C-alpha cells in the first residue's frame, strides 16, 4: 500500500491538476497546516506555475487570535505563500456561534477569491462523519445527509476538499513525519458546541466499537449525494416546465403530483433561487396555508428574509421590503429623482407616460401605496384601487413599490402602469413625458 504522502499527492493531482490559482483556507490548525504543506510541496515538485495564496479568518472569539495570525504569517513567509487575513464579526443571535462563524468565513472566502481561482479547504474523514451525524440529528433528508462533497460549486468557481478521504489520525502521522507546527484551539475542548460534543464524547465510542465507522458514514453520505443527484436529473425537466420566466412556480401542475414528488420539486424551487432548503413542516405549511388558501385570500409564509406568496395560481418568493407607504418625495421635475430602496430613478425623457405640465401652484411629489377610488384614462367608470390593481395584473407586493405622481393632493399617474383623468391637459397645453428607469422591482 502506498504511503500517506504518495496517496495524498495522487489525490491532489486528481482534484487540482488543471488549476493554476489556488486559495487555501488556513486556520493554522493541524488539518489546514497539512493541506498547505502538501500544496506547497506539490507546487515545488510538480508545477512551479501554480499561484498559491492562503487566507486566515480572525473570528474575534479567542484571546489568542492575534497570535494565530502571526503564526500563520510566519508559516506562509517560510513556505513562500502569499498570505492574507481578515477579521469578522460573529452574530450568533439567530444561528448560534458555530453556524455564524462558518457563514462569516465563507463570506470572506467569497469576497477574497480572484478570477479563475479555486478555493481549497481542509475538512477530513472525521469531519465528514461528524457532519453526517449532525445532519441526522436535525432530521435531514438525502440532501443534508450527503454532507460535504469533495467538489462543489462556490461563488462562481469551485470549492475543493481533497482531504475528505483521510482520517485525522492519518493527517497527524503526516504532520509528525514532516515536523509541522500547528495551532491547538482550546475552544475545541468545549463540548457545549455540538461538533465538539460529537468529537470528544461520541466519535471515540463509535470508533472503539466500530473502527470503520467514519468510512461507513462517509460512504452513506456519498450514497445520499448520489440519490440527490439522481433526483435532480429526473426532476430537472419537470421543474423547468413549472418555473415561469419570473421565477414563480405553477400550482396547478404541482397539485396533481404525489406529495413526495411535490415536496421534491418545491425544495428544488428553493434551490433554484439560492435559498436554504425548507423543512418538511415548512413545506406542509407552504402547500396548505399558501398554495391551497381560499381563492380570495392573499396568503404569505415567511422564509428567512423572504415571503412565499400566491398570485395567479403561482407561488412567488418575494423579498421582505421596507414599507414605503409613508414616504413622500418632493420632485423638481427639471432634475432626476432617485427613488428609495433601489427602485431606480425618475426623469423627463423622450419615452414614458405623458401627463400635463403642473401648474405653478401645484407641488409635485412621489408617493407610494394609493388607496381609494381612481378614475383612469381609457376607463369610463372609476375603480377602487385594489380592484384596479387586480384588473391591471399588478401583484399585491408590487403595488406599494410603484411610484405615484401627485400634483398637490391629486393623483396624476402610477408610473409605468396608468394615468388618471386628472393627468390630461386642456387643448393646446404642453405635455410632459416621464420615464421610470427601474433597477429593482421584482
Swiss-Prot record:
Protein family per UniProt: Belongs to the tRNA(Ile)-lysidine synthase family.
Domain of life from the UniProt record: Bacteria
Classification via Pfam families: ATP_bind_3, TilS, TilS_C
Native source species: Photorhabdus laumondii subsp. laumondii (strain DSM 15139 / CIP 105565 / TT01)
Catalytic activity annotation: cytidine(34) in tRNA(Ile2) + L-lysine + ATP = lysidine(34) in tRNA(Ile2) + AMP + diphosphate + H(+)
Entry remark concerning the domains of this protein: The N-terminal region contains the highly conserved SGGXDS motif, predicted to be a P-loop motif involved in ATP binding.
Molecular functions (GO terms): ATP binding; tRNA(Ile)-lysidine synthase activity
Cited SMART domains: TilS_C
GO CC entries: cytoplasm
InterPro entries found in the cross-reference section: Lysidine-tRNA-synth_C, Rossmann-like_a/b/a_fold, TilS/TtcA_N, tRNA_Ile_lys_synt, tRNA_Ile_lys_synt_N, tRNA_Ile_lys_synt_subst-bd
A biological-process GO annotation: tRNA modification
Sequence positions that bind ATP: 27-32
Name of the protein: tRNA(Ile)-lysidine synthase
Taxon lineage: Bacteria, Pseudomonadati, Pseudomonadota, Gammaproteobacteria, Enterobacterales
Cited function: Ligates lysine onto the cytidine present at position 34 of the AUA codon-specific tRNA(Ile) that contains the anticodon CAU, in an ATP-dependent manner. Cytidine is converted to lysidine, thus changing the amino acid specificity of the tRNA from methionine to isoleucine.
Amino acid at each position: 500500500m502506498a504511503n500517506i504522502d504518495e496517496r495524498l499527492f495522487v489525490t491532489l493531482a486528481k482534484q487540482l491538476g488543471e488549476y493554476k490559482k489556488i486559495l487555501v483556507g488556513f486556520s493554522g490548525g493541524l488539518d489546514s497546516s497539512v493541506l498547505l504543506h502538501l500544496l506547497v510541496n506539490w507546487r515545488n515538485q510538480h508545477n512551479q506555475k501554480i499561484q498559491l495564496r492562503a487566507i486566515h479568518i480572525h473570528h474575534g472569539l479567542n484571546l489568542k487570535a492575534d497570535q494565530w495570525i502571526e503564526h500563520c504569517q510566519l508559516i506562509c513567509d517560510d513556505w513562500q505563500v502569499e498570505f492574507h487575513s481578515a477579521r469578522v464579526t460573529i452574530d450568533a443571535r439567530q444561528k448560534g456561534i458555530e453556524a455564524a462563524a462558518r457563514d462569516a468565513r465563507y463570506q470572506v472566502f467569497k469576497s477574497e477569491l480572484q478570477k479563475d481561482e479555486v478555493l481549497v479547504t481542509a475538512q477530513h474523514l472525521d469531519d465528514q462523519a461528524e457532519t453526517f451525524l449532525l445532519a441526522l440529528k436535525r432530521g435531514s433528508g438525502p440532501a443534508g445527509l450527503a454532507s460535504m462533497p469533495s467538489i462543489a460549486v462556490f461563488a462562481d468557481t469551485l470549492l475543493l476538499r481533497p482531504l475528505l478521504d483521510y482520517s485525522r489520525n492519518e493527517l497527524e502521522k503526516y504532520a509528525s513525519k514532516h515536523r509541522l507546527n500547528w495551532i491547538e484551539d482550546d475552544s475545541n475542548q468545549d463540548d457545549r458546541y455540538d461538533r465538539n460534543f460529537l468529537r470528544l464524547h461520541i466519535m471515540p465510542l463509535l470508533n472503539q466499537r466500530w473502527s470503520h465507522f467514519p468510512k461507513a458514514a462517509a460512504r452513506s453520505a456519498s450514497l445520499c449525494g448520489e440519490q440527490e443527484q439522481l433526483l435532480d436529473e429526473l426532476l430537472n425537466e419537470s421543474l423547468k416546465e413549472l418555473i415561469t420566466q419570473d421565477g414563480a412556480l405553477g400550482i396547478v401542475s404541482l397539485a396533481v403530483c404525489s406529495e413526495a414528488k411535490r415536496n421534491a420539486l418545491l425544495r428544488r424551487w428553493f434551490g433554484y433561487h439560492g435559498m436554504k432548503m425548507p423543512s418538511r413542516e415548512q413545506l406542509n405549511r407552504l402547500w396548505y396555508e399558501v398554495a391551497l388558501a381560499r381563492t380570495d385570500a392573499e396568503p404569505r409564509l415567511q422564509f428567512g428574509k423572504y415571503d412565499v406568496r400566491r398570485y395567479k395560481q403561482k407561488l412567488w418568493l418575494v423579498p421582505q421590503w421596507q414599507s414605503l407607504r409613508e414616504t413622500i418625495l418632493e420632485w423638481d421635475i427639471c432634475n432626476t429623482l432617485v427613488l428609495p430602496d433601489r427602485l431606480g430613478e425618475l426623469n423627463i425623457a423622450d419615452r414614458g407616460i405623458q401627463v400635463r405640465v403642473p401648474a405653478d401652484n401645484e407641488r409635485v411629489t412621489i408617493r407610494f401605496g394609493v388607496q381609494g377610488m381612481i378614475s383612469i384614462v381609457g376607463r369610463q367608470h372609476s375603480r377602487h384601487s385594489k380592484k384596479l390593481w387586480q384588473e391591471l395584473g399588478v401583484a399585491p407586493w408590487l403595488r406599494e413599490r410603484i411610484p405615484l405622481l401627485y400634483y398637490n393632493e391629486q393623483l396624476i399617474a402610477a408610473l409605468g402602469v396608468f394615468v388618471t383623468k386628472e393627468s390630461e391637459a386642456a387643448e393646446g397645453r404642453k405635455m410632459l413625458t416621464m420615464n421610470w428607469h427601474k433597477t429593482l422591482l421584482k
